[in-house]
């Protein structure tokens, strides 16, 4: 028999739901799923077109759809709807070197994402195109994901510690035409040759027409091909405004590969509306902070 432990008072004070409210919400989600999720979608998502159809679930076929007649944009929901308070804190980035940590406001995030999105569009990337993101854990990785979402491109994040072979396999399998990377990554003081790995991987990826490189360290970018782009230089050629592409709720948002522990890694395609709502209601607490 399992034991039940009480939640410490210090934790209770930081949550946005008490135990009774959570239990009530849970029962409502089980007993009235359509109305429950309709309420959550209206409360947490800003829609271009509100959905009338909430869900379609056929478990035997493995076919599940959420809000399939709704229209929205993930980048808008993550950034633009918060711009009434542009100095509010959007990202706290902890660097490998603690002296270089950053706090990024929604206003700054918006500008960087829009410039990145315009750079992608200038490279011919459009709605539905696949973009591989092979980067260290730096703010530009988030800018890249949100820029893809802004223009309707589908991103596939590949862990920066993966080998050349693993990177190549994921680029080919997801049919990516663009790779976003950095000259190097840093983990625990160790340098990881990301750009070098990309150069090796794309020799077997004929569809890749652009490699956008962020300068993470003081080492040279090693731009050796006509497909290579210096992100820090190129992004400043573009304005900090980019309209959001209207996306159907069931349009693809990103691809994430399984671990491969039971066979070849499989690309799991996540769609926009359902994923976004799940991400929105997951945090235990949420507080708007203002940059000092």
Residue locations for each model-derived region?
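Hydrophobic alpha-helical segments in the ANL/AMP-binding
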Residues: 77-80, 121, 139-159, 166-168, ...
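Structural core segment of the AMP-binding/adenylate-forming
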Residues: 146, 150-233
């Amino acid at each position: 028999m399992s034991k039940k432990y009480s939640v410490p008072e210090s934790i209770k004070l930081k949550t946005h739901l008490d135990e009774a409210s959570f239990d009530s919400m849970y029962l409502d989600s089980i007993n009235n799923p359509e109305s429950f999720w309709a309420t959550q979608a209206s409360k947490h998502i800003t829609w271009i077109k509100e959905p009338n159809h909430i869900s379609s679930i056929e478990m035997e076929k493995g076919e599940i759809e959420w809000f399939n007649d709704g229209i929205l944009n993930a980048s808008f929901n993550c950034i633009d709807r918060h711009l009434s308070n542009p100095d509010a804190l959007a990202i706290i980035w902890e660097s490998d070197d603690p002296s270089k940590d950053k706090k990024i406001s929604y206003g700054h995030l918006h500008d960087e994402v829009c410039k990145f999105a315009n750079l992608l569009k200038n490279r011919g990337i459009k709605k539905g195109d696949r973009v591989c993101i092979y980067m260290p854990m730096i703010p530009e990785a988030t800018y890249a994901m949100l820029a893809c979402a802004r223009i309707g491109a589908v991103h596939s994040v590949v862990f920066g510690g993966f080998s050349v072979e693993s990177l190549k396999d994921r680029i080919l399998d997801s049919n990516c035409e663009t790779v976003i990377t950095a000259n190097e990554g840093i983990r625990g003081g160790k340098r990881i040759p990301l750009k070098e790995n990309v150069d090796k991987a794309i020799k077997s990826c004929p569809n890749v027409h652009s490699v956008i490189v962020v300068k993470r360290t003081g080492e040279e970018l090693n731009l050796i091909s006509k497909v290579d782009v210096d992100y820090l230089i190129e992004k400043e050629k573009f304005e900090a405004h980019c309209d959001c592409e209207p996306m159907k709720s069931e349009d693809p948002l990103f691809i994430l590969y399984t671990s491969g522990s039971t066979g070849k890694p499989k690309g799991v395609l996540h769609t926009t509306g359902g994923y976004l709502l799940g991400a929105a209601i997951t945090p235990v607490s949420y507080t708007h902070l203002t940059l000092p």
